[in-house]
């Protein structure tokens, strides 16, 4: 072995051995417990970032530790390869999205391999490959058969210049991101999946998951089970009697209704605008701008009076109808009751348009005022009805029951459970995605593609130009024959939401070569024992994947109903930011590698200059690594300079996996220095370590016993920390071990070999290359087999036994020293040793002991 640690040589050698042995190819094995651990598959954006490195290293550490403990472990990898960024890159570079995507996959796969990850590459998938998305199409057709998939009109963002549909994130301040045109809302036919059919199960099954409470709460809120009342305001129009339906969780405030607001797309709005140009103008304005709920929540609330009134269902009084830009047709009934006295949004709206405000609840000790909104106005916990006729004096629950009963008696409505969750619209008017397997025939209508004709293959040679969907212009793709009648027909040009692709990939990993969507191997591996990914996926991806899994179960494809037993949301990687600001307020951000920072005597940054010109830059603070702040660190540069093991060690040591990690160049150097110490000790002591000298534990001297006691004591803690995923303290334990071994004076070769072997196995899951090579070079592999499958070291409990123990010595309750006594010393012997100790003589002021308190194994307190 080399005297000096050369990471590039060490890592190349280890990876060569792993490739030759096909070390990470995994098969099902009923004789072992299985552990299936998955990192959320990456989007092939071009390069890995440090967040990827952290995520995959956590997964890899888990894999290696459990494999050493006898588990049949699996760590696969794939690519979430469809999506809008590929189309954007294609437009920018004039190349098909497919080429951009596959080139990125090749580069990023090479980066992963250089990290030494224990990935079974025989299971690799890319969601843009026909052999994968065929099953998206197949399951979509099954859902269509079962009524889970259906078609209806939906509202989208339409760019009138580019003639294309925009995603919510492509609408910036109401304008298209490319054209700058004012965005319109359009109603177009789209396919939806009935996720609401599973709402109760999605909510209730959260209780059985080992997921972070924060994620569970986010999903609960998104599903949004609400108990309220659905009712209607009666009206007559064009000779017909109808109800303007609304849903409310605050039926106790119904007597405070002073207006109703409806969405611009509501049928009543359309009818009322027929002969009122001012209403048409406002409706057109509402149709410009994003359709995202978040956009609606933050934009200025506007409205226009229709001049039409409905009747209050309980009093018969007229209630004016307004069209409001904050009411979404896609949520609830597309209409809301306005109670400005007790709803903050309605209060602001009423103040803006000078609408009546009526107080109908009060709270003890509070004074109601129309001047400004107060939080208690909307508090149902302290609410008591007032100015509400027969409901006066009732509290929230009583009032809701009474109002619901009266509405029901009048035929206007009743109690109802509703959900914030909406059916999943999966149609996307984009090119780079899974084609929806539908054919449009002039005679037969919408016809599903026959199963034997799947997959409908997406052409990979098209280059989008931003003006509509390229599929609609591709005659080769578009034109086909109707499967029913044989007439000329057109293919559906919409593609599926890319969340479809990521909703079941972890099941396909288990049977990547199956001629069916999944097979028996899937039930062996699934559900995932551990899923790892960022908190940003807490709602959409994780909720959709849970729904998709339940659909697969109900179709008889799998036996499980949840995709992942446990979830780890790793913390973000942070780094310093630096910038300069010009006269217009525009900031230019500089990478930390291009900046020199000065620190005060406590190590805090106090100033910085740009290396190229020596002029000052502003310290922007520590933020998440991102392209926008230019504060990322290229993992490849780190690996090239220090090696993959150093990158892995730093990311595991710097913080617990679930917490944020602050980047530190000094920390990276420290990790590298530690690995050099591990290697140097092995090289300097290779003769003793490779000698395979045995020893009689009972005959060992005190130095050997002390070293073994320390190593096995630390091993016990490290094992516990591995089990609870606290890898930062595992690394701390390894550092303690090295210090103990390196500092042991007079340790015999046999004990040195034993304890260093424990250190290598403890470190191996975190830094597999250097430990694998040391294990082999020092002869451990000849004795125990390659480190890949070496058994996890067992704690030698006998080594932890001590002839003497140390007790804290107190005089009058204050610590005054330490007392060494025989482990099995009697109480009398301990008391005698305590009063004979120099510390007692020094701190008792010559007074005799009145009382001696002995806490076995811990302390002695002498009271004088």
UniProtKB/Swiss-Prot annotation:
Motif location ('HIGH' region)? 42-52
Query: What reaction is this protein's catalytic activity?
Result: tRNA(Leu) + L-leucine + ATP = L-leucyl-tRNA(Leu) + AMP + diphosphate
Residues bound to ATP are 627
Q: Which InterPro entries match?
A: aa-tRNA-synth_I_CS (IPR001412), aa-tRNA-synth_Ia (IPR002300), Leu-tRNA-ligase (IPR002302), Leu_tRNA-synth_edit (IPR025709), M/V/L/I-tRNA-synth_anticd-bd (IPR013155), Methionyl/Leucyl_tRNA_Synth (IPR015413), Rossmann-like_a/b/a_fold (IPR014729), tRNAsynth_Ia_anticodon-bd (IPR009080)
GO cellular component, alphabetical, reads: cytosol
What GO biological process terms are annotated to this protein in UniProt?
Answer: leucyl-tRNA aminoacylation
Q: What is its EC number?
A: 6.1.1.4
Q: What is this protein called?
A: Leucine--tRNA ligase
